[in-house]
Regions:
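N-terminal glycine-/charge-rich "phosphate-binding" loop or analogous flexible N-terminal tail
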Residues: 1-48
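Short, well-ordered beta-strand segments
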Residues: 3-4, 49, 71, 133
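Structural motif corresponding to alpha-helix initiation and N-cap regions
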Residues: 15, 33-40, 54-58, 79, ...
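Phosphate/diphosphate ligand-binding glycine-rich loop within oxidoreductases
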Residues: 47-127
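A short, basic/flexible loop-to-alpha-helix module at the beginning of a structural domain
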Residues: 128-135
Length: 135
């Protein structure tokens, strides 16, 4: 079995443990980035693919008849042509619950910024002003 990781740069080193892939497959190929023009070459004899942002569509799937599964290291599936995957019998998995807490925290941080102008006040302090407009 062959697994291809198409865009490992999207995952910070240490965030994911890839050893399970190496235990599962005979061959694992890992590419930091894969442009669209290289997808068919990288996936031609792959059984499984792991991706985040690579566009996988009919043209790519036509060139990769062994591909059976695509795992996304993201919540969204917009990088895949899901209908094309269905037609080619390629299963798709994503991580729908990934970063839910972080998104909520970020939303509250932005709300507090809008309400309090924290960034403007921090910039004023860095520029040597203790109170707005007073040197």
């Amino acid at each position: 079995m062959k697994i291809v990781v198409l865009d490992s740069y999207c995952v910070r080193p240490g965030d994911l443990d890839w050893t399970g892939l190496y235990d599962l497959a005979d061959v694992v190929e890992e590419y930091p980035r894969t442009g669209y023009e290289l997808l068919a070459d990288h996936l031609r004899d792959a059984d499984f693919a792991v991706s985040n942002k690579c566009r996988i569509d009919d043209a790519v799937l036509d060139a990769c008849p062994r591909l059976r599964w695509v795992g996304l290291t993201a919540t969204g599936t917009d990088s895949l042509d899901l209908e094309a995957c269905r037609r080619h019998g390629v299963a798709v998995a994503n991580v729908p619950g990934y970063s839910t807490n972080s998104v909520a925290q970020h939303a509250f941080a932005l709300l507090l910024e809008v309400a309090n102008g924290t960034a403007a006040r921090a910039a004023s302090l860095r520029d040597g002003y203790w109170q707005s407009g007073v040197p």
